[in-house]
């Protein structure tokens, strides 16, 4: 039994996943695709773990199978593994494995192997230590390779189910040939907020694919994610001439953070909104031209504004983490976090509400995954507390990307980002004595009742 109760939309998704999975299991085909589309912040991992755990308790269904859970980093692999422990504590009937457990030589019934996709598809020799060399003379004297694990599992007539997290990132031709074809799983569960592949009607009718989708509006109504994203882009910044664009971005972001902090305080909430600042991955290239890096610009600006760098600023770069302990807590004193791509996916900090994103130096690429870091709502179980504070139910992006370069994930026609703000001019006054009325077209006489 889970320690947490699912929301209604999550229960429905878990039920649909189970029904679709069982339908594909009965198919004679292999590599059947079950595509699970669910918005960022909807609890995809929560739903997946409950779906997998639920297979252990189905009446009249107890087939011999094991799972391989694919992520694209070691950190995310461990996060997914830890979620199982968090949700089910001692009630889990699945053994949770990592590459350290290769020594058992195979996957037992209901085992779940969590593994970093990059360690399986990398072409670099130093990163392919998990794969069996093509030259037998290069094989290690003892231990098991990934191929050994798969072969030994099948020798016991045990099926394998693959779960590919963030499948839109990983399902390349290389991944297909070097991993999926090797595993030859019975079912592949592709999980993504923005899947590249969605089964067509013919595939569904043939029984080789299924599609389960969660509506964004259901997630918003449950209070898990913010309603919309407000965006200020390069075009908006150029409408404010006479200011350095880098510093203008910081000024606008800080002002917004202060406004949000004031609103939280007025509600009696001990929530400190966080600004996350994404620096260019190629920030170092500015040094070669004699320019200050964006990191230097940001740090100098914050220092100039009297912000205590040691107490209020966190850094998250490869091999460098400063002031990151407990930063996810709503009451954390950290106001700013600088990062590159590290926080792009899988990092949860609901109090992160303002994203400042600088363009890449050489080849501008807007990282849509990063937007997901400001989508989560800060207090899902207290959504009614915010009914009169719409600003607190929004996320905010300040960027020097152009408007047509900004891509907000899972943005439907009903959920377009705010990019224009209209104001009435101060010199305009209401016109007294003018009234308006609404008359339906039927009453007006230009539209028939039919």
What are the residue ranges of the model-derived segments?
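Conserved pre-motif I regulatory segment
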Residues: 1-37
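A short hydrophobic beta-strand->loop->alpha-helix junction that borders the nucleotide-binding pocket
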Residues: 68-74, 99-102, 117-118
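Conserved SF1/SF2 helicase motif Ia
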Residues: 28-37, 47-77
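Walker B beta-strand of ABC/ABC-like P-loop ATPase nucleotide-binding domains
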Residues: 162-164, 338
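Helicase-associated low-complexity regulatory tails and linkers flanking the ATPase motor
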Residues: 15-20, 54-60, 78, 82, ...
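The conserved Walker
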Residues: 40
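SF2 helicase motor core recognition
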Residues: 123, 338-353, 372-374, 385
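Conserved glycine(s) of the Walker
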Residues: 43
């Amino acid at each position: 039994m889970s320690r947490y109760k699912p929301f209604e939309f999550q229960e429905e998704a878990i039920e649909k996943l189970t029904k679709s999975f069982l339908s594909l299991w009965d198919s004679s085909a292999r590599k059947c695709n079950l595509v699970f589309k669910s918005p960022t912040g909807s609890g995809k991992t929560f739903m997946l773990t409950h779906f997998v755990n639920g297979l252990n308790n189905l009446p009249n269904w107890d087939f011999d199978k094991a799972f391989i859970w694919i992520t694209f980093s070691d950190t995310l692999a461990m996060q997914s593994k830890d979620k199982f422990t968090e949700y089910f504590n001692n009630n889990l009937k699945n053994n949770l494995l990592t590459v350290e457990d290769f020594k058992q030589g195979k996957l037992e019934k209901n085992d779940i192997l969590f593994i970093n996709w990059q360690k399986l598809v990398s072409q670099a020799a130093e990163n392919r230590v998990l794969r069996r060399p093509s030259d037998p003379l290069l094989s290690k004297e003892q231990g098991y390779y990934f191929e050994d694990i798969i072969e030994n599992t099948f020798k016991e007539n045990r099926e394998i189910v693959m779960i590919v997290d963030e499948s839109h990132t990983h399902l390349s031709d290389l991944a297909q040939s070097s991993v999926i074809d090797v595993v030859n799983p019975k079912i592949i569960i592709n999980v993504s907020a923005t899947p590249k592949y969605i089964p067509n009607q013919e595939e569904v009718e043939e029984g080789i694919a299924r599609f389960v989708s969660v509506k964004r509006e259901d997630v918003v109504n449950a209070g898990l994610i913010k309603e919309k994203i407000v965006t200020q882009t390069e075009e908006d910044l150029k409408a404010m001439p006479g200011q350095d664009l880098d510093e203008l971005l910081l000024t606008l972001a800080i002002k917004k953070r202060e406004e949000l902090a004031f609103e939280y305080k007025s509600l009696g909430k001990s929530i400190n909104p966080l600004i996350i600042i994404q620096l260019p991955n190629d920030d170092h290239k500015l040094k070669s031209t004699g320019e200050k890096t964006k990191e230097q610009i940001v740090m100098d600006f914050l220092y100039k504004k009297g912000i205590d760098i040691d107490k209020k600023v966190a850094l998250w770069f490869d091999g460098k983490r400063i002031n990151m302990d407990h930063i996810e807590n709503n009451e954390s004193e950290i106001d700013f976090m600088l990062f590159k791509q590290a926080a792009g996916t899988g990092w949860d900090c609901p109090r992160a509400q303002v994203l400042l994103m600088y363009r890449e130096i050489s080849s501008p690429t807007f990282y849509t995954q990063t937007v997901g870091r400001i989508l989560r709502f800060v207090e899902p179980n207290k959504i009614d507390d915010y009914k009169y504070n719409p600003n607190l139910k929004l996320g905010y992006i300040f960027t020097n990307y152009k408007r047509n370069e900004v891509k907000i994930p899972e943005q439907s026609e009903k959920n377009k980002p705010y990019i224009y703000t209209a104001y009435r001019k101060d010199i305009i006054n209401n016109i007294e004595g003018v009234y308006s009325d609404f008359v339906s077209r039927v009453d007006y006489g230009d539209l028939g009742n039919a």
